[in-house]
Amino acid sequence: MSLISMHGAWLSFSDLPLLDNAELHIEDNERVCLVGRNGAGKSTLMKILNREQGLDDGRIVYEQDLIVSRLQQDPPRNVTGSVYDFVAEGISEQAEYLKRYHEISHLVMTDPSDKNLNELAKVQEMLDHHGLWQLENRINEVLAQLGLEADMELSALSGGWLRKAALGRALVSGPKVLLLDEPTNHLDIEAIDWLEGFLKTFNGTIIFISHDRSFIRNMATRIVDLDRGKLVTYPGDYDTYLLEKEENLRVEELQNAEFDRKLAQEEVWIRQGIKARRTRNEGRVRALKAMRRERSERREVMGSAKMQVEEASRSGKIVFEMENVNYSVDGKVLVNDFSARVQRGDKIALIGPNGCGKTTLLKLMLGQLQADSGRIHCGTKLEVAYFDQHRAELDPDRTVMDNLAEGKQEVMVNGKPRHVLGYLQDFLFHPKRAMTPVRALSGGERNRLLLARLFLKPSNLLILDEPTNDLDVETLELLEELIDGYQGTVMLVSHDRQFVDNTVTECWIFEGEGRIGQYVGGYHDARGQQSQSMAQKQARTKSVAEPVVAKAETAKKSPAKMSYNLQRELEGLPQRLEELEAALEALQIQVADASFFTQPHDYTQKVLAELSQAEQALEEAFERWEYLESLKNGA
């Protein structure tokens, strides 16, 4: 028997139902990804499965005594108290007893008065009476699993840690089905990696919503697509789903075209003259009416957003130049002796944990903050369009239309006037939705509105700080295409690994203590180079001391002059170094070309491997030359 079975589900809040005779079956020990466009009803379906929202029609059957728990889409806001209290509230009926026990236990440690000891005894008696010691142990186990300190104040936690606390609250009830709504939102890449590992050890079923394609690929054992009120199951991985979904849409398009052709023929027949009416078949008339009704009820596939950047005139060749830049806040080093050059057309991602200084570096580059030391030079003719991750630019009380156009009826798009409603439809805002206050929008809709505003501004430098949060996959892919075709310079911050892979030619990785590594390629290319670089440094550190000692001992034992073969090798090394430098420079020029990463993945990986080998060969040749020179001078 399924853990959850939903039959003939119907739910509507407007003209178009969110669920239209939908069916769903959830089995034990599977990880189901629920996909669909923004506004399709995925979060509402999660609430239904968690018994928070009822159906207009249909029924849901749960396995007896099934425990379901849900992690909400946004991390908790404006919460106070300890982590322990917050997590304990996941067991709602017994939470007060457990919270009081935790509180009085700590109080007794600092003030073991008779009053406090008597209170502790009473609370312990209540725990005994209700059999709550097992729940106390479970809370402590969950806190330990998540690396959470019981006495940490919620108000002092970052978004990522609040997310962990919320996950602990969802887990503590011992659910057999765990519902996760956008679990990677507000998490950095390291936290996402941790979450993937943790969830794979979960003993139960996970149903999750995510637009992070890497996360879906790593987690999902089955895809359920919510499309126009129907739930369609696709067994297997995410890439298989994409292929099958595309084929299903192609077949649907052909079937609709054939249906429309037949309907048009019947409409011609019914409108023919007296001769046709004499032989009119009443059954055929009834069939035509049924076809008309079916056509009127058809829900078309939701269109894709149409984004276009208003590009300004070209900037100067050098966009930014930084030399030995340092910046600290309250004693914490965020940028340490950083030097870099950004040229026109570069597309660079800033990668690192939350709070490491990515947004700070962008503000330093734009002159919004002053560096402690070092030099930052901004290029000429820069026209900046800045996408803010905190969404502070939108007025929640004004409508979508007014937030975009300040009460005007037209906006300028590529130098031509365009009606606001028409422009907003390119970003999937129906005219009715354009009249809605911003406070009523979903996260994805707010993001689309910010992008609509951003792309009206002429620019040759795009600064995108977390642009992918809450965007559905189709809009994400369109944004990727837009960035790929953008002729200006792009600097972006994102924790979406595939988005970074698909958009940038260089990554700046924050490696701790203000150090920033610069690597060519997308996210996975950069991580590979970073790992290789660290391994080489460790190998060099290990080899430096040992050969030095060995060489010193050899020199003491054998002060004789160099052999003929070593002399010949030393004489040939300068030419060898020139050849290696030339080969390395040629590879660097090839990789730096803007079109390099548009070529096949296997080819780019081969060239990057050759680049790494060339760097290593040059370094080894220099070390060999220095060693032979030291032998020569000591001979």
Outline where the language-model segments fall:
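ABC ATP-binding cassette signature C-motif
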Residues: M1-A257, E311-A635
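Intracellular alpha-helical coupling/juxtamembrane segments of multi-pass membrane proteins
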Residues: E244-R277, N281-A287, M291-R298
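A short, polar/charged loop/turn motif at coil->beta-strand junctions and beta-hairpin connectors
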Residues: A264, R299-G303, R314-G316
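Long, charged, glycine-rich C-terminal linkers/tails
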Residues: V301-V309, P437
